[in-house]
């Protein structure tokens, strides 16, 4: 079916009255015709200094809404949309009274509401843009005139469906190239000023507008088209969705299959049907916008109603509640299609729980979901969740893992590399990949533009056998890349650099690229092979060198932007002198996923520390989620642990550790003291704040690169000494001598490199039973031993420690009589 794309007569007359050129109207009609015919999106940039761009957006969007509203029945019939109303989104940085953002919105609305009074207009500020997740719009007006974050760009643009238009309001490009935005102001950290902030990201964004198809540019003030389609169009051929055949042998209700828009979605429902009778695991991967979460939402309800359970509980988890909005929305819709009355619970405007008779589906953060009892566990955006947490869900009877490969939540092959490889060793599972987009058709130019500008599909360089030979010989060098060159000339090295993070365990956000591009204190380092290929990526933040006045404020509670390590040292170690010293904080370090565990990360650290030394810096440090693997990596590379956060990260489930490697003599003195203090605190924290810390992590936190014991006297009274000896001789039980054993165990962990050797299991036993005070049953389970064996082993360890350390305690004995 071919439809006419032409603004209604009254719209054209209104536009002429407002002095809108016919050529700009034709440009908009052509853009819409292209969008509908291809079921893609099109973008029109309206640049200008005045309110003219907002007025123009209001008139053009009004005309588009009127055209689209005429053909809603045809769109519904072809399953190109669900809603029977044209939905328009206006997104801006501010809507408060007397703000420029508000003035532009009012100017837009003044004209739009006259021309398209029946369209549903939603306005949102970037701060609350997550409120529109799970919704789909026909028209988007995105006001980038002052402030925006790249995260907003990725999140908002992807809400527009195929056949829709995006109007972007900007300042004149020449002005915008040199502008500082609110995002830029957030990057200023002492001792830098706004003048030090770069503008590489905006320039990249502007350049990308002109490089991709489907993007047209209008100077609103001059009423001049600067980039137009090759030829005008006044007709559009309505596209058809791919024909989806519903299998004959289905177990879920047919109504649920009728909600599917692609064969891939049907396959997801069929896969979950297999879980009705038998427990199992399904893994689902897709690029963004392929209907992955929607499919799981529909299938979960199918599983719930076909099971024989009276009350079917579904636990849904993801890094953030916003990640599962489509899933929960379609779970609710599926229930309604089947005639159920539903109840939803929302949190900050987002759906958190959906209930119907005998069915409950609820979101939990990753660290809490696996602790709940449920009949089905759904782990969405799994690549953004730390691998040890994923393994907790791996143990569940019925579990679905889904993950975005490329896109706003993407983590590339990292999910496969880090998790699925090991999962295969534990259990069988069915893997499905969805490739056909739902919201728009394949080949959408706006998706290509978005992926390009935000580097969402970046991947590292491919490695050959010759490259591995260079790695084995460690023929590598560290380099500081020219970020101006990388961003201005769109070098492949930039994609390879970001691609390493995308495929590593890091959870990437579009703003990470902008931070690297523009933050004055952020720099990149790369470890290259002799042939130039990047194998390790490092992002560093320059910290310290803080003025005394700011340091004094920090000591009283002020938190300066950036300067994470100096701020921690001032507040938690009262080391005000440290804030004057200068150093590198390693924000992110990752090695090519195909070259892991070959020593490249350690080599990169070695060369970075050498560079810092040559530049006269005082220290190199980092903050990260404290997994056993990472703590061991940093400690073995000579870094001292100086802090551990009191709470776990709700997404990764890890405590955050901060490590420092001192370079200057003054830094060595301060860091040595801080490391001693930390180790001392940890002996107490393990019985309280960090009672749930994994012993295998705790043991590495006690390690020190300085090799010396903490200078802290341990006291035992004469009676405690006697009771300790009676415990060793099997006269008294452990529970009656805890007060005497604990100081002895503390002495062991506060000792230096000369402490007696204990194996990993023995160390775990001391931490779990003595310092963390867990009972015998829990400790035996941890060690995979019987309770009796565990009791005997603890007594043997204490005997050895007592014979080794009792001479040190001799002079410290006190009598309390």
Swiss-Prot record:
Residues noted as binding ATP in the record, renumbered to the chain: 265, 289-298, 439
Limits of the N-acetyltransferase domain: 469-664
Top-rank EC class of the record's enzyme: transferase
Keyword field: Acyltransferase, ATP-binding, Cytoplasm, Nucleotide-binding, RNA-binding, rRNA processing, rRNA-binding, Transferase, tRNA processing, tRNA-binding
A Pfam match: NAT10_TcmA_helicase
Sequence intervals crossing the membrane: none
PROSITE patterns noted in UniProt: GNAT
Compartments in which it is found: Cytoplasm
Key word Manganese present: no
Key word Secreted present: no
Function: Catalyzes the formation of N(4)-acetylcytidine (ac(4)C) at the wobble position of tRNA(Met), by using acetyl-CoA as an acetyl donor and ATP (or GTP).
UniProt protein name: tRNA(Met) cytidine acetyltransferase TmcA
Species assigned in the record: Pyrococcus abyssi (strain GE5 / Orsay)
């Amino acid at each position: 079916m071919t439809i006419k794309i032409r603004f209604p007569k009254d719209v054209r007359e209104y536009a002429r009255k407002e002095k809108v050129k016919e050529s700009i109207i034709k440009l908009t009609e052509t853009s819409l015709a292209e969008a509908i015919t291809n079921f893609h999106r099109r973008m029109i940039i309206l640049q200008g200094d005045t309110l003219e761009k907002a007025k123009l957006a209001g008139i053009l969007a009004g005309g588009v809404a009127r055209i689209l509203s005429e053909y809603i029945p045809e769109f519904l019939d072809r399953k190109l949309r669900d809603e029977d109303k044209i939905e328009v989104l206006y997104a801006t940085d501010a809507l408060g009274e007397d703000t420029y953002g508000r003035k532009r919105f009012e100017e837009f609305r003044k004209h739009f509401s006259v021309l398209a009074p029946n369209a549903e207009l939603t306005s949102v500020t970037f701060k609350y843009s997550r409120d529109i997740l799970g919704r789909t719009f026909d028209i988007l007006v995105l006001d980038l005139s002052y402030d925006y974050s790249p995260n907003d760009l990725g999140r908002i643009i992807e809400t527009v469906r195929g056949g829709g238009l995006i109007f972007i309001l900007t300042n004149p490009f020449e002005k915008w190239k040199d502008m500082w935005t609110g995002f830029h102001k957030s990057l200023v950290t002492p001792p830098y000023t706004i003048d030090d902030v770069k503008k590489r990201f905006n320039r990249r964004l502007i350049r990308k507008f002109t490089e991709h198809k489907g993007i047209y540019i209008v100077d609103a003030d001059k009423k001049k088209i600067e980039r137009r389609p090759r030829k005008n169009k006044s007709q559009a051929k309505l596209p058809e969705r791919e024909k989806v055949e519903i299998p004959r042998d289905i177990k879920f209700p047919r109504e649920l299959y009728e909600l599917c828009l692609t064969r891939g979605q049907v396959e997801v429902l069929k896969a979950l049907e297999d879980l009705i009778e038998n427990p199992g695991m399904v893994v689902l991967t897709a690029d963004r916008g392929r209907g992955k979460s929607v499919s799981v939402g529909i299938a979960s309800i199918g599983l719930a109603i076909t099971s024989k359970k009276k009350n079917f509980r579904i636990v849904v988890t993801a890094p953030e509640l916003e990640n599962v909005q489509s899933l929960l929305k379609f779970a609710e819709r599926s229930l309604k299609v089947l005639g159920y009355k539903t109840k939803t619970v929302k949190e900050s405007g987002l759906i958190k729980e959906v209930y119907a008779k005998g069915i409950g589906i609820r979101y939990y953060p990753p660290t809490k979901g696996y602790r709940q009892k449920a009949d089905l566990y759904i782990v969405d955006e799994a690549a953004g969740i730390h691998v040890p947490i994923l393994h907790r869900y791996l143990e569940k009877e019925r579990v679905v893992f889904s993950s975005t490969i490329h896109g706003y939540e993407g983590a590339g092959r990292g999910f496969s590399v880090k998790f699925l490889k090991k999962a295969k060793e534990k259990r069988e599972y069915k893997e499905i990949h969805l490739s056909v987009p739902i919201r728009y058709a394949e080949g959408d130019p706006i998706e290509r533009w978005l992926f390009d500008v935000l580097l969402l599909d970046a991947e590292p360089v491919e490695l050959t056998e010759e490259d591995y030979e260079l790695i084995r010989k460690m023929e590598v060098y560290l380099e500081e890349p020219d970020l101006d060159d990388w961003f201005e000339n769109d070098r492949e090295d930039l994609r390879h650099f970001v691609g390493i993070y995308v495929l590593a365990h890091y959870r990437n956000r579009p703003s990470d690229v902008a931070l690297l591009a523009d933050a004055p204190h952020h720099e990149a380092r790369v470890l290259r092979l002799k042939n130039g290929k990047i194998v390790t990526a490092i992002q560093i933040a320059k910290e310290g060198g803080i003025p005394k006045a700011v340091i004094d404020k920090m000591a009283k509670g002020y938190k300066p932007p950036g300067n994470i390590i100096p701020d921690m040292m001032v507040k938690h170690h009262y080391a005000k002198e440290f804030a004057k010293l200068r150093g590198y904080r390693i924000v992110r370090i990752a090695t090519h996923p195909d070259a892991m565990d070959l020593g490249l990360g350690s080599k990169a650290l070695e060369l970075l520390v050498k560079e810092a030394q040559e530049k006269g810096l005082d220290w190199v440090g980092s903050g990260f989620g404290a997994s056993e693997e990472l703590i061991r990596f940093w400690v073995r590379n000579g870094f001292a642990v100086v802090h551990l956060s009191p709470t776990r990260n709700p997404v990764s489930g890890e405590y955050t550790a901060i490590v420092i490697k001192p370079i200057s003599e003054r830094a060595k003195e301060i860091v040595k003291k801080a490391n001693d203090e930390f180790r001392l605190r940890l002996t107490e924290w393990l019985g309280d704040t960090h009672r749930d810390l994994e012993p295998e992590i705790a043991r590495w936190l006690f390690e020190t690169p300085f090799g010396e014991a903490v200078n802290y006297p341990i006291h035992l009274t004469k009676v405690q000494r006697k009771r300790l000896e009676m415990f060793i001789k099997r006269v008294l039980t452990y529970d009656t001598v805890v007060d005497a054993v604990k100081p002895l165990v503390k002495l062991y962990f506060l000792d230096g490199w000369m402490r007696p050797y204990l194996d990993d299991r023995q160390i775990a036993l001391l931490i779990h039973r003595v310092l963390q005070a867990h009972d015998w049953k829990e400790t035996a389970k941890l060690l995979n031993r019987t309770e009796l064996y565990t009791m005997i082993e603890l007594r043997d360890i204490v005997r050895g420690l007592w014979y080794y350390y009792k001479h040190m305690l001799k002079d410290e004995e006190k009598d309390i009589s």
